[in-house]
Amino acid sequence: MSIDAGKGTVVTRTREKDGKEKTSTEHMRLPPDLYNGLVTPIVKNLSPDSAETKVSMIVSTPKPRVITLVMRPMGTTPFSLAGFERKGLQYEIKIELGGIVGLIAPVVGKAPPDIYMWVEGGEVPVFLRETGPLFEGGAILRINLIGPSWPENNR
């Protein structure tokens, strides 16, 4: 998917069942807070004292649509790094589909699952872990840095 925010053009490329590539161009009214590809840097720089932060993102499902990501702090989780005890800031990321789809999706069991991300705050915030799907309908995956050790009961 490529986005030209200035022109409001979104181009998607998909592969059909017969293997042929299909290209679609959509002209959309794009919000000024569009943050595709920047979720991790945004979360790394959120204040743990903020109530919630909302940003817009385009997803290709397969037709492009604008969704809202609602990010909110969930407290801290202990972990250790090189034998030193630390605290990771945990954030929950909810996906708001909006419109009629947003109303129907939970009823028919198609609401996207929440995503959880942990960062270590400070002057230079660091990504630690993420739990959630990487694409629509994908399995819940956990992406970790290799070094930190986490409690067993942590999502």
Task: Report residues per predicted region.
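Acidic, serine/threonine-rich low-complexity disordered tracts
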Residues: 1-6, 50-155
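Contiguous hydrophobic, core-forming segments of folded domains
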Residues: 1-63
